[in-house]
Amino acid sequence: MEINWNQIETKWQAKWNESKDFETNPNEKPKKFITVAYPYPNSPQHIGHGRTYTLADVHARFYRMRGFNVLFPMGFHYTGTPVLGMAKRIQSQEKEILDGLRNVYHVPEEDIKTFVEPIKIADYFHEEIKSGMIEMGYSIDWRREFTTIVPGYQKFIEWQITTLKESGKIIQGSHPVGWCPRDQNPVSQHDTMGDVEPKIDDKNHLVKFKFGEYIFPVTTLRPETIFGITNLWVNPNTTYKKIKADDEKWIVSEECAKKIEFFGKEITIEGDIAGTEIIGKYATALHNNQEIPILEAEFVEPAIGTGLVMSVPAHAPKDYQALMDLKAKNHELASKIEPVPIITTEGYGEIPAKEICEKMGVSDQSDQKLEEATNELYLKEFTDGKLNDKCGDFQNEKVQFGRNKVRDWLMENNHLEKFPVLENAPVKCRCGTECVVKVLNNQWFLNYGDEEWKETARNCFDEMNILPSKITTEFKEVIDWLHERACARQQGLGTKLPWDKDWIVESLSDSVIYMAYYTMSRFVNDETIKPENLTKEFFDYILLDKGDASLAVSTSKLSEDVISMVKKEFQYFYPVDSRHSGRDLVQNHLSFFVLNHVAIFEKKLWPQEIVVNGSVMMDGAKMSKSMGNIIPLRTAIRDYGADPIRLAIISSAELLQDADFNMESVSGIQSKLESLLEECSNLKASEIGDLKAEDKWILSRTQGMIAQVTEAVEKMRLREGLQDILFSFESDLSWYAKRVEAKGRDNVSGILHKINSTRVAMLSPFAPHIAEEMWEKLGYTELASKSVWPEFSKESVDATSIQSEELLKS
């Protein structure tokens, strides 16, 4: 039976819309509040985006059939600068972006012309994404829809950000951030090409050496190793810059001079000096006045750090091998240098770098094995190493603690200062500019570095359900390394800081507790509540149970009945029972979601569950415009049907694995669904009568399938559950057909009708449109989505028949 997928989907979407079953209000049933990260509308969604939303929809539909009152809402995240950068690129007629809009996303030319206005871009793709979600069959309560720039939501964000500031979670100060020099704004994942979160390594420092009237600032991650320095490395092919940095004279690479302009220093270029003019001379270590020779090394990259490197050959494999290479050439200065051991580590002798280079068979300083040697030795010394007697007052300190003590000592004496770097450079802003690290002064930060706040978040993670459970360690690692994060910027769409209107709340700070706004957004949308009614006292009373109803009534100018209705709605639906998102948001949004909930709400309102999924590949390759393998979701729906796409995404991988989407699997799923629809069309409900042994067996096996699928869906092992419904059970049906045929029976339609009713009901959350069509063919008048999820019945399992059939099979 060949299916017209789009016709069937349109038919059932109209019936769902008419029935209003997905419009959820409080009632006497137990509730499930399921949310998924709202999309940023700067492009249409493609098949990869469809995975997260499809998984969440299966979850919502499953619990609805289990008798829960399920709220599954959706909003749209307009906040930030991406559409601003996009509008600038369109205005300057950038070929790459225009080609993508025309040839990949098929945006009409008349719409592209309006895209010089950022809001037009967001509005266009908002409607495009929403249409795609409806066409995919997502069971969303659209009455609660909002964007993050509507006045009601902005009132909510003003309250949220004020509450955080009043509790000391927002501070003002100086801190390094990822920065776009063109837009003059901090950047985060939503602002960069490829959605890359700029990772700042703020453990990098400059150690200062004296060179005549100049300072040689040298970057290091290991300040404790200054006691083992034997020489400095300079690239003979680099021309360095003489600069004035505030009141000090420095020699650094040209690339470094540009970087430190963003550190709040006043920089003046005074001239050039060739690397060859420096090599062979001596610098002075400020901490002990030791004369340090300067040697040549072509491995020194001017773009990394300051373009100058300090050498600790006893403990740095790269330094050791570079020194050995020079010694092999009978280099006069190098021949006088011997490694100075300053760390003792169990399992290593006096010169650990020498040992590990020899063990790994490193040949010279270009050997790629040096990277592995470095990582292995650095980790071992950090965890197990102790500083020796050459380290003065720091003797016997463990490296992991002594490092910070040496750092603080050097900093107190002005021998060291911070030099934050972009760990995952190059990162490009959506406007096309390469991002840098900037030290912002008088910036507003969320103080995610606060240890007490971190510990509360850890407690929340310990008590919540995280699927799959192995992702829990990633969350804890994020909490460990998180530090102050800029929560405002001076450009972009969004909500202004209530106390400083020059700043706008940034996109990863206004998207952390918005799930609470879903519980009241329908009242704002139908104008029961106006934005001006949303006062601080209103939010305090509804969301925090602070103050009293009379204060909320007097400040909001709302009736007590309306206030009571909104409060009951919030108290009924909160907390969030399950939060769905992709793995790429673990390091920011999902962690911030937990941190902000524990900062604002009482414990009983903390999130109950987080579900994290992997991404989607196309025929084994990452989806990208450059590879030409991006398929917009709506295009795929038109070409293949929503349900085949849903099932292809689900069946290709378990939760955290990257799903590999391919047309072969879509075609196979289409055939399977067509076959099942035809089978359902030929079955009629009829009296079953006395059960034979094979009937008892197949009905028992059906109960086993119910138990397995139910457990799989509860644990979000959807691939496994779908496999059981569509494929694994087929072998049981084939055996049953053989047994029936062997006995010459032709009256088993009633049993097959019962079994397939069970299968179709369980298929409904996965492939809702075709399941409704099958359900109708089976003779049911109610919607499949309103049917009850099949319950496992132990009484319906006949152990004797199972044993008998297994004996027959064998």
Language model features with spans:
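Residue patterns forming the tRNA-binding/recognition surfaces of aminoacyl-tRNA synthetases
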Residues: 2, 11, 15-19, 90-227, ...
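Amphipathic alpha-helical
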Residues: 8, 13, 166, 170-192, ...
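Residue-level signal for inorganic ion chemistry
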Residues: 16, 77, 168, 323, ...
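N-terminal catalytic cores of NTP/NDP-binding nucleotidyl/phosphoryl-transfer enzymes
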Residues: 24-88, 148, 157, 218-221, ...
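Short, solvent-exposed turn/loop segments enriched in Gly/Ser/Thr/Pro and often Arg
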Residues: 28-30, 38, 73-82, 145-153, ...
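Conserved active-site neighborhood of enzyme catalytic/cofactor-binding cores
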Residues: 39-74, 96, 180, 194-215, ...
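Structured, non-catalytic alpha/beta "coupling" segments that mediate domain-domain communication
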Residues: 71, 223-261, 408-448, 666-680, ...
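Protease-associated
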Residues: 223-308
